[in-house]
């Protein structure tokens, strides 16, 4: 309290400089000390600065916590007179997305839902949730995330191959999440292995045989429809996993990626409540010396990935999770969110 009172004696620009050096938690504590500081710490310019500075470092983002990026380019206040009408609430945007604070923004389940979920967890289910996994990050990276998944039992043990078959696709592979829940992943590759490997070595795109391109829509965007076999998969699964290439300069055309995602989550093929997990993947961990000394990150930030894939336009719940293929870092966090969206009690 004494320090907070002392800071009031500083010039306003110096007060703002000091606030930029505080953590969001410390700022909120400062705001609780007096009405003066409560007003000061809500300054939109301060929180817009924090958003621009910190968003690229966030390891995940989802449909609840995604900031309105277009607001970063709008005036801080509306009206002829200064502060006549406040503009966008950047403080709320920041605290919703900040990893240490975001949990409180998720909708709370009513008490009866918690009891129902607990009772359901006591009864073994006949089928495990199934997810379709696809995307260029499975095929373009130097390290295969799919191969790592199958051979890293300390992260996700393989539970086996179920009997339920889908013609031309197979039955997928079942995994066990933290010795609690089984789930099944159906892997959808764009083409055969030889063509994928050649395209990876030459860093070229391949003709995606999962989709049929049907020209362009009225807005000029490409329009795709899944092949009949892939449509059968979309109707059978409980959600989707899109593996995106997060290595800068190596991602596919965002417009095409968005159109293909939109084709698979089409409400005509299943409920729009089914979740989409985007694993924003790079081959290897970023070395500490590069991470701390270079301003150029070796991965696309997850907020930028969500924007590139136009995820805020989807009716489905979605999440982007930073992932590393070599160590599978981030995979468990993404799977936890996915299973939770499917109604499993974790």
What label would you give each PLM region?
Residues 236-346:
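Conserved GTP-binding G-domain of TRAFAC-class P-loop NTPases and closely related GTPase folds
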Residues 150-200:
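Switch I (effector-binding) loop of TRAFAC-class P-loop GTPase G-domains
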Residues 200-248:
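Inter-motif core of Ras-like GTPase G domains
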Residues 4-5, 24, 115-121, 169-173, ...:
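Eukaryotic intrinsically disordered and solvent-exposed regulatory patches
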Residues 24, 35-37, 45, 136-140, ...:
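Conserved beta-strand elements of beta-rich interaction domains across eukaryotes
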Residues 142, 193-202, 219-222, 249-260:
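Active-site-adjacent loop/helix micro-motif of nuclease/hydrolase catalytic cores
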Residues 1-126, 132:
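Skp1-binding F-box subdomain of Cullin-RING ligase substrate receptors
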